[in-house]
Design a protein with these regions (language model features):
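Hydrophobic faces of well-ordered beta-strands that scaffold small-molecule active sites
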Residues: 24-30, 51-55, 115-121, 148-152, ...
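Active-site beta->alpha loop and helix N-cap motifs at the rims of alpha/beta catalytic domains
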Residues: 55, 59-160
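Active-site-adjacent beta->alpha loops and helix N-cap segments on the catalytic face
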Residues: 35, 128-134, 152-166, 179-191
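Catalytic alpha/beta core domains of metabolic enzymes, predominantly
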Residues: 170-231
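Active-site beta-loop-alpha junctions enriched in small/polar residues
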Residues: 31-33, 58, 122-126, 153-157, ...
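Glycine-enriched alpha-helix->loop->beta-strand junction motifs that scaffold or abut catalytic
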Residues: 49-50, 144, 161-172
Length: 231
C-alpha cells in the first residue's frame, strides 16, 4: 500500500520549509563555490529550510569544469605540485569545510540532528575495507568539522569499515543502497557500533548516520523498462 503526504499550500509558507513540520529534513545533493561565498546557501537554509548537503566527485567535476570559480586553486603555484587527486581534495575539502561552517547553526539548533555535509571516500576504495578506513579517518581529521559526514558505500567490504568508523565516533553517510536486505545489514552495523561504544563507556548520544537509497537510479531503470513496454 502506498501512502502520500500533501503539504498544505498556505499563503506565504514555502512548501519546502513546510516539510520540517512533518519531521522531514531536505538535503541538497549539490555543492559549488558561489553558493558558499555569495550567500546562496545561507538563503536556502533560512528561506527553504535546507538541512544538509552532500557532495561527490561527479558533482565537483561539474562545478569545476562548468565555471571559473576554482581558478584561484587551479592556477596557484601549489597546483603545479599536485596530481589530479591532490587538486580535487584541495578544492573539495575547502568547499566542504566552508559548507560545514555555514550549516553549523543548524547543527547546533537541532541538537546535532541536522546540519551535516557529506564528503565521499574515493569510489576506487568501494571494495577495499582497509583503504576505506584509512581514507575516511584521514578526511575526517583533515576537514576537522564535527558536522562532517563521511560517505562510505554499503558494499560487503564497506560494511566492516562502516561499523568500525561509527565505533570510532565518525559520522557516516552510507551510500550505494538498493535493497531492503542491504539496509538491514547497515542498520545492524550501526547498532553493533553503538553497543561497542557503550561497552567502552563512550558517549553514543552524538553518533550520527544516515542511509542513502539511490532512488534516482531505480527511477531511471524503471523508466527504461516502461519505455520498452510502451514500444
Amino acid at each position: 500500500m502506498t501512502t502520500s503526504v500533501t503539504i498544505p499550500k498556505t499563503a506565504g509558507v514555502n512548501p519546502l520549509k513546510g516539510l520540517l513540520e512533518y519531521g522531514q529534513s531536505p538535503w541538497m545533493d549539490y555543492i559549488r563555490r558561489d553558493l558558499l561565498t555569495g550567500g546562496g546557501l545561507k538563503q536556502m537554509i533560512n528561506d527553504d529550510g535546507l538541512r544538509g548537503m552532500t557532495s561527490n566527485p561527479a558533482i565537483f567535476e561539474k562545478s569545476i569544469v562548468g565555471s571559473t570559480l576554482y581558478s584561484d586553486i587551479l592556477t596557484s603555484a601549489e597546483a603545479k605540485t599536485l596530481d589530479a587527486k591532490g587538486l580535487y581534495e584541495k578544492i573539495a575539502i575547502r568547499d566542504v569545510q566552508d559548507a560545514c561552517d555555514i550549516f553549523k547553526p543548524v547543527y547546533q539548533q537541532t541538537h546535532r540532528r541536522d546540519g551535516y555535509v557529506s564528503l565521499e571516500v574515493s569510489p576506487y576504495l568501494a571494495n577495499d575495507t582497509k583503504g576505506t578506513l584509512e581514507e575516511a579517518r584521514r578526511l575526517w581529521k583533515t576537514v576537522g568539522r564535527e558536522n562532517l559526514m563521511i560517505k562510505v558505500p554499503g558494499t560487503p567490504e564497506g560494511l566492516p569499515a562502516i561499523r568500525q568508523l561509527l565505533e570510532d565516533g565518525l559520522n557516516i553517510n552510507i551510500t550505494l543502497l538498493f535493497a531492503q536486505s542491504a539496509y538491514e545489514q547497515v542498520a545492524e552495523a550501526f547498532l553493533a557500533a553503538l553497543e561497542a561504544r557503550a561497552l567502552k563507556g563512550l558517549d553514543i548520544s552524538h553518533s550520527a548516520s544516515v542511509a542513502s537509497f539511490f532512488v534516482s537510479r531505480i527511477d531511471t531503470l524503471v523508466d527504461s523498462k516502461l519505455d520498452e513496454v510502451v514500444k
